[in-house]
Amino acid sequence: MIEVVLNDRLGKKVRVKCNDDDTIGDLKKLVAAQTGTRAEKIRIQKWYNIYKDHITLKDYEIHDGMGLELYYN
């Protein structure tokens, strides 16, 4: 179980606990449950890398305590 911190740069930080074999799509659903926005409207990225929904957190080497950027489409 890892904890990922997502910052939307509008003053909101979301902390989500998930497994490292979860996909980015699963992470979006967990974030959507906490923020109240739809999962389809969420984009997760780090610098200029936009993460795709079907790839796991382990494949992207996302580890415990890592900070990601949260954008709303």
Swiss-Prot record:
Pfam families: ubiquitin (PF00240). It is found in: Cytoplasm. Disulfide bonds: none annotated. Keywords: Cytoplasm, Ubl conjugation pathway. Transmembrane segments: none annotated. Residues 1-73 form the Ubiquitin-like domain. GO terms for biological process: protein modification process; RNA splicing. The keyword Cell inner membrane does not apply. GO terms for cellular component: cytosol; nucleus. It comes from the Eukaryota. Gene3D superfamilies: Phosphatidylinositol 3-kinase Catalytic Subunit, Chain A, domain 1. This is Ubiquitin-like protein 5. The gene is UBL5.
